[in-house]
């Protein structure tokens, strides 16, 4: 299947500059193509992942992806989709962010073989361009009226836009022209808000490389959820690729909780499952939605892809333990992942009567309530029901000598660590 046909059935194409030309080009040649990301933060979130998934599909089809990390453009900030001016970051912070993104993106692509990916930083070819060179060699090629008409600028004219952000599209166009000239890059991929920046690059290539220069642009639709909320966010905020910001367990849970109305769309966008495999899962959503086979597949595929097989196994283990209540088999690391958002208490490293211990920590409001809950079998320590009012809490009640998991009733969890 032609990669363009595959992207179309996946619903992953919003706009392209020359469909017939690009389709023919990718059928007949191995092409280089790129997608960029600015280091505005130290981690990608799953919304950033969308265009890079397209880039990876091109690699799977035998083409060469170029991943551009914007060490230069990141110092300015892309005005696309922003209602107000970005705050500029220090060069030191941007450099740190660049390295963090390099690590994350390095896990997504193959860097060996005939279709090996490459990673570039636009700071390398931008840092020595003087202001006079910029104005003479590049600024001269851009018509201000055309720049003002592009959505990325027009949407900001009422509230105002600095020359810095106004000039962003010139810098991004310089990137495409540079990669065309030195890396034989023929295609730029981006989100739907990048159309103006991409077409600016194509115009510059034609002016610098000649009217017969073959280059293309392709954008991806804005991904929306069936309930109208923004994709990529949970109640706790953005879903990050950095495991220190969003644990693999939380990452897995985000996908497993996907709405039935969205899951088939996400399978097409984010996984490498075939059309037949996705069609089969779509049927199960219709006939056996309670089994959540599509969500389980989506969560497993994404956790493996972004993290690892080991991280998936860990997420499944935590999920199973929380569902069954058998938490004793969890490691300290797994407990930190699975109980990240539950009320947490710090206890003295001493022995104590269970009832007193629950009240001292604040898990129970009073001794009377604590005795009642223990006596009724409503208190569980590390998954085991406790009904002995005289029980002494000691080191044997700690997992890896670090944590005690308390459950009150069926679902109310508390995590206790020790001084």
From Swiss-Prot:
It catalyses: tRNA(Tyr) + L-tyrosine + ATP = L-tyrosyl-tRNA(Tyr) + AMP + diphosphate + H(+). Its main location: cytoplasm. Keywords: Aminoacyl-tRNA synthetase, ATP-binding, Cytoplasm, Ligase, Nucleotide-binding, Protein biosynthesis, RNA-binding. A motif ('HIGH' region) lies at residues 39-48. GO terms for molecular function: ATP binding; RNA binding; tyrosine-tRNA ligase activity. ATP binds at residue 233. One of its GO terms (biological process) is tyrosyl-tRNA aminoacylation. The keyword Transport does not apply. It holds the Pfam family tRNA-synt_1b. A motif ('KMSKS' region) lies at residues 230-234. It comes from the Bacteria. Its EC number is 6.1.1.1. L-tyrosine binds at residues 34, 168, 172. Catalyzes the attachment of tyrosine to tRNA(Tyr) in a two-step reaction: tyrosine is first activated by ATP to form Tyr-AMP and then transferred to the acceptor end of tRNA(Tyr). HAMAP family: Tyr_tRNA_synth_type1. Belongs to the class-I aminoacyl-tRNA synthetase family. TyrS type 1 subfamily. Homodimer. This is Tyrosine--tRNA ligase. It comes from Listeria monocytogenes serotype 4b (strain CLIP80459).
């Amino acid at each position: 299947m032609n990669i363009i046909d595959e992207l179309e059935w996946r619903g992953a194409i919003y706009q392209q500059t020359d469909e017939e030309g690009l389709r023919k080009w990718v059928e007949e040649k191995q092409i280089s193509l790129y997608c960029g990301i600015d280091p505005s933060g130290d981690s990608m979130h799953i919304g950033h992942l969308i265009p890079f998934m397209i880039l990876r599909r091109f690699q799977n089809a035998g083409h060469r992806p170029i991943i551009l990390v914007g060490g230069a453009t990141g110092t300015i900030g892309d005005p696309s989709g922003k209602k107000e001016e970005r705050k500029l970051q220090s060069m030191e912070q941007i450099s740190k962010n660049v390295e963090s993104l390099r690590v994350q993106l390095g896990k997504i692509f193959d860097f060996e073989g005939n279709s090996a990916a490459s990673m570039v930083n636009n700071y390398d070819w931008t840092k020595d361009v003087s202001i006079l060179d910029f104005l003479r060699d590049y600024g001269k090629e851009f018509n201000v009226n055309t720049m003002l008409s592009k959505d990325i600028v027009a949407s900001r004219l009422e509230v105002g836009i600095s020359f810095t952000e106004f000039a962003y599209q010139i810098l991004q166009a310089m990137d495409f022209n540079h990669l065309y000239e030195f890396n034989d890059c023929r295609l730029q991929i981006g989100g739907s808000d990048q159309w103006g920046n991409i077409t600016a690059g194509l115009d510059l290539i034609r002016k610098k490389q000649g009217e017969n220069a073959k280059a293309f642009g392709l954008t991806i639709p804005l991904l929306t959820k069936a309930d109208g909320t923004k994709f990529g966010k949970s109640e706790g905020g953005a879903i990050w690729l950095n495991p220190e910001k969003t644990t693999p367990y939380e990452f897995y849970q985000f996908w497993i909780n996907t709405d039935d109305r969205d899951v088939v769309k996400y399978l097409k966008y984010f996984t490498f499952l075939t059309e037949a495999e996705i069609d089969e899962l779509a049927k199960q959503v219709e006939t056996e939605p309670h089994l959540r086979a599509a969500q389980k597949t989506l969560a497993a595929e994404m956790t493996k892809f972004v993290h690892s097989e080991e991280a998936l196994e860990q997420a499944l283990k935590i999920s199973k333990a929380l569902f069954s209540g058998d938490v004793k088999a969890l490691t300290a690391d797994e407990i930190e992942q699975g109980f990240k958002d539950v009320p947490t208490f710090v206890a003295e490293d001493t022995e104590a009567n269970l009832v007193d211990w629950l009240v001292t920590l604040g898990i129970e409001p009073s001794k009377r309530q604590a005795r009642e809950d223990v006596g009724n079998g409503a208190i569980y320590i590390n998954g085991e029901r406790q009904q002995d009012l005289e029980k002494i809490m000691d080191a044997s009640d700690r997992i890896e000598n670090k944590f005690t998991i308390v459950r009150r009733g069926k679902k109310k969890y508390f995590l206790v660590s020790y001084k």
